[in-house]
Amino acid sequence: MKKEEYLEKVALANLWMRAYYEKDEPLASDEEYDALIRELRVFEEQNKDEISKDSPTQKIAPTIQSEFKKIAHLKRMWSMEDVFDESELRAWAKRAKCEKNFFIEPKFDGASLNLLYENGKLVSGATRGDGEVGEDITLNVFEIENIPKNIAYKERIEIRGEVVILKDDFEKINEKRALLNQSLFANPRNAASGSLRQLDTSITKERNLKFYPWGVGENTLNFTKHSEVMQFIRELGFLKDDFVRLCANLDEVLKAYDELLALREKKPMMMDGMVVRVDDLALCEELGYTVKFPKFMAAFKFPALEKTTRLIGVNLQVGRSGVITPVAVLEPVNLDGVVVKSATLHNFDEIARLDVKINDFVSVIRSGDVIPKITKVFKERREGLEMEISRPKLCPTCQSELLDEGTLIKCQNIDCEDRLVNSIIHFVSKKCLNIDGLGENIVELLYKHKKITTLESIFHLKFNDFEGLEGFKEKKINNLLNAIEQARECELFRFITALGIEHIGEVAAKKLSLSFGKEWYKQSFEAYANLEGFGEQMALSLCEFTRVNRTRIDEFYKLLNLKIEKLEIKSDGVIFGKTFVITGTLSRPRDEFKALIEKLGGKVSGSVSKKTDYVLFGEEAGSKLSKAKELEVKCIDESAFNELVKE
């Protein structure tokens, strides 16, 4: 890299940094920004005499805004050096002159906060700011429920940590903002930062923020280990994450990293890495600091789940109900080991809300098995080559005229090939008839060769239907035919789910099965509407579907031997007739607790109200627990629940 190119990249990095930290309006993904900073560092290490004083590597990002007073930290708040792989970790440890006794914990992706306590009372809270001076957000800090306002330590002390928003709460916040036509937060970190810097403290309160301490600033503690400091801080009443440990050497650090990375999707809040620091405080003092980082700690970053790429086109997909779904075609990008080439755009209202165009740079996020989605459009990076995404008039599959209902655009042709194929794929899927071996590609192949053309035709398949088809040999054919035969004996609720009735999912199908048995499709509007959890919309959908398809369901009954699940309910226990809400992370899947509660005659609701009898909560319980406490609903942990069900 030449000096001129280096200075251009310094200017670009500063532009991205100001947009991110000062305006909460990022112009690039974290991965893009990190890569740019690493390029600058490589040049600076090789050209120490040409380092620009304006380089972001030489300063802490400013976040001071005019709406809040400035407040000086008693001791500087440092950022951390990033390392991205084993070789970089070992290089950092070598520079730190330490290869044993490391303290490690998750690096939560939130907003840093500095709390000052005097005489055991919380007196102020401030953002990191430029490291020396932050924003005074004390009034908002007092609205964060899990921050102790009084502690059993009378000396002056700064306690530092990360403010996060749980993933579930983040989704609810964005759902609410969408209804109000407000811009959506790109990620939970931006939401946490924005929530802390509200002029209206009631908004901060309703966001259900969580604070996790990771260190101290000014203090008079006499501990010799950082682990001892953190144990003391948590004993004062602060939250502690389950994954905090001491590692004897770097091999243990690497093992812990792999373990934590495997927990990434299960954690209720976002993590972007693992903090690794020297545990010996005397050695930390000896090592000191660079111009920007402590030498005794580093952030061992996870692979990015969010990256920037370009939207190069839009494909239209036709669902089994005829709804047209636009899918973004992307320049391929590697997200956590998976090459992502497309992302959902949901519907054309979402396209309008995002104001996304073909050739835009966009930020794409992938989480677990969730379909990748676009979280942000970088409009400031437009080059004049962008093209509008127009609403379709004709079905991309059958070319029939589409019905435009505003949010939804539908193909009304019931013989549309994509509608039929997707209906069959849904019918045989795991949560429906669960026909092993009859996956999406096989369904498409069989439909293409006219071996299956309706849902019913699946059960008329014979051995010779598969002969000559690519990939089908005797064993595979017999296995598939056996799986189809086994599916004839499926539970009634699975069959109802498989029919793909609008608004009727697995839970509603179970309710219909248990309430009406095989006569479920012969009921009145009132009978449907009176079912718990059902409403007018679901009842209307059922009435319309069963009116049109009653004869067809009768024919299915001749093909299938459907089983009705019977729930044996214990009616004399303390749980009988009680309503539970489950929240947080428990030792076993929620479905197991739900099944036990229902077996004992209780029921499980998805929301807390005055009619709720118990809230069963686990680790990182969210807003449901807070609401339960406000309504004075009895809250029990897993241990108390186990005692309750023993009675």
Curated annotation (Swiss-Prot):
PROSITE patterns: BRCT (PS50172), DNA_LIGASE_N1 (PS01055), DNA_LIGASE_N2 (PS01056). GO terms for cellular component: cytosol. Its cofactor is Mg(2+); Mn(2+). Its EC number is 6.5.1.2. The active site is at residue 107. Keywords: DNA damage, DNA repair, DNA replication, Ligase, Magnesium, Manganese, Metal-binding, NAD, Zinc. NAD(+) binds at residues 30-34, 79-80, 105, 128, 162, 301. GO terms for biological process: DNA repair; DNA replication. It catalyses: NAD(+) + (deoxyribonucleotide)n-3'-hydroxyl + 5'-phospho-(deoxyribonucleotide)m = (deoxyribonucleotide)n+m + AMP + beta-nicotinamide D-nucleotide. Residues 570-647 form the BRCT domain. Zn(2+) binds at residues 395, 398, 411, 416. InterPro entries: BRCT_dom, BRCT_dom_sf, DNA_ligase, DNA_ligase_AS, DNA_ligase_CS, DNAligase_adenylation, DNAligase_N, NA-bd_OB-fold. GO terms for molecular function: DNA ligase (NAD+) activity; metal ion binding. Belongs to the NAD-dependent DNA ligase family. LigA subfamily. DNA ligase that catalyzes the formation of phosphodiester linkages between 5'-phosphoryl and 3'-hydroxyl groups in double-stranded DNA using NAD as a coenzyme and as the energy source for the reaction. It is essential for DNA replication and repair of damaged DNA. This is DNA ligase.
